[in-house]
């Protein structure tokens, strides 16, 4: 089941185990159970620290990752391959006693939860966002005996996941808890536990404080650290929006990679330098005083710095039509790689005729029954090679000059209405899902009246990546820079860093 390269990598990782692990498997006579049994046997044969026993669990096929004689609360329902294979390997190592790579303050927060909390997360194995949530909840289960977590592959347990239209979908004690990517800190916050502000207030002022965690942020941080400046990063997550990107093929010298791999490599590169990286928390305000630039965090802590580089990136742009907000995660989705498998053999729409929209339609056409692509303009804007591929697919319709006007449905999406711009007629297409791919909106809501923004809400910068406020710079997709590309953002981050350094030595 595992190829030779994966086995070799796994063998090296299993050598890091610090104790014994027991797979407790619930297996039947079905094909999926046989596949799971084969996977578990392959893994167990690679380490003397791993044993397998069989026992009836809540779901079949499934298995728990326990210590001998001790339940950890970690269960995988289905076969954790694809993006979830890393979640399994990490669970094995942590259950064996390998210390988690998490700040002690976060570990203390997890230990302080009283519980009991029983989490279940529905995933798809092609989902880029799901492993973050699965790994966060598995970690919490390892640390706190009052927490349990089960990963559920929606493709295996279709009856349970029938009404799940966006993953990851997290349930706590049977009630919906959250959707989409969540960090450990996000989960702790939703449970009412917040990071102690004193942990941040006691920090010495920085030379450069970078707000955001994407490519521009990483580039800026490395450049300023190499200049010997005291550098800090405050971000929700390292990698930013890139984490949600499936394939990257235009980052020069790297022929092909994924968003998650890119983000992991970025985090490793940042860690090689003396950079104070604060993740799982967001900035809520910024102001320049006579003595410093002050950045307020969501826990009301305040950080001070001589200069600040804003690189908070952008988020998916919404249609802003009736029914959309109400039916997000109920058929309205933004990530075809994550949520596409949930619409197998169903009819869906893709909104947007740029590269992202056409790529999404091509990918979805291989999964769903039928795709209708809507584009507001009179022609598609995607690269010609993508358009040719799209038009060759038999289960795709293209509607140009189409203005979407309403998402239809009560509890779930049942259709979309649009206006034909050439005739003025309103029409309805019955379908089950809508994937919105109309670009990004800058994450600048926290910057109102702090720095100058343009009509699109982007931070306005000059050739030095400086804003209108001395000492405050900006880089990446959050700015009014025309082209939004990873490689351009990294160059912008470096430019902002070098000009922040120049500002410091001149002031």
Curated annotation (Swiss-Prot):
EC number assigned by the record: 1.8.1.-
Keyword entries, A-Z: Disulfide bond, FAD, Flavoprotein, NAD, NADP, Oxidoreductase, Redox-active center
Disulfide bridge map: 335-338
Cofactor: FAD
Cofactor comment: Binds 1 FAD per subunit.
UniProt-listed CDD domains: AhpF_NTD_C, AhpF_NTD_N
Main EC class the enzyme belongs to: oxidoreductase
UniProt GO molecular function: flavin adenine dinucleotide binding; NAD binding; NADH-dependent peroxiredoxin activity; oxidoreductase activity, acting on a sulfur group of donors, NAD(P) as acceptor
An individual GO BP term: response to reactive oxygen species
Binding site for NAD(+): 347-361
InterPro entries membership: AhpF_NTD_C (IPR044141), AhpF_NTD_N (IPR044142), Alkyl_hydroperoxide_Rdtase_suF (IPR012081), FAD/NAD-bd_sf (IPR036188), FAD/NAD-binding_dom (IPR023753), Ferredoxin-NADP_redctase_2 (IPR050097), Pyr_nucl-diS_OxRdtase_2_AS (IPR008255), Thioredoxin-like_fold (IPR012336)
Residues reported in the UniProt entry to bind FAD: 207-222, 467-477
Summary of subunit composition and partner proteins: Homodimer.
Cited PANTHER family: THIOREDOXIN REDUCTASE 1-RELATED-RELATED (PTHR48105)
Task performed by this protein: Serves to protect the cell against DNA damage by alkyl hydroperoxides. It can use either NADH or NADPH as electron donor for direct reduction of redox dyes or of alkyl hydroperoxides when combined with the AhpC protein.
Something else known: The active site is a redox-active disulfide bond.
UniProt-listed NCBIfam families: AhpF
Family according to the record: Belongs to the class-II pyridine nucleotide-disulfide oxidoreductase family.
Name of the protein described by the UniProt record: Alkyl hydroperoxide reductase subunit F
Organism per entry: Staphylococcus epidermidis (strain ATCC 12228 / FDA PCI 1200)
Gene, per the UniProt record: ahpF
